[in-house]
Regions:
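An N-terminal, well-structured beta->alpha segment
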Residues: 7-104, 110
Length: 112
């Protein structure tokens, strides 16, 4: 898939209308191709301190879509490892933490 295809797919499935609109704006402006490349050059990776990155639109930034996908993956794995898993979610004062907390809680709740 091209960067454009990945970005279009991302915007179509982004649960946050603001970040989805930002990606669509990037796609419409050829002068911002480098920024589009930066945001879609590969997914944000889970490191020793968890998911960390600049908050913003795209697969390589912290946003609700990344939190949704990561939480879904965690719950899928955890559900195969433990019967009736329990999960604790925390948040802090960093920008977006409360929204990310709520998003993770919604995914966990939907997973049962």
């Amino acid at each position: 898939m091209s960067i454009t295809d990945v970005a279009c797919d991302w915007a179509a499935h982004d649960p946050d209308p603001e970040t989805a609109a930002y990606v669509l704006d990037l796609l419409e402006d050829p002068a911002r191709a480098a920024e589009l490349q930066s945001r879609f050059s590969g997914p944000l990776t889970f490191g020793t301190a968890g998911l960390r990155g600049e908050v913003g639109a795209g697969e390589s930034r912290m946003n609700r879509a990344v939190v949704t996908r990561a939480t879904y993956g965690l719950m899928d794995w955890l559900g195969r490892q433990v019967e009736g898993p329990r999960v604790v979610i925390g948040c802090d004062a960093r920008h977006g933490s409360s929204d990310f907390y709520t998003t993770a809680a919604e995914v966990i709740s939907a997973a049962g």
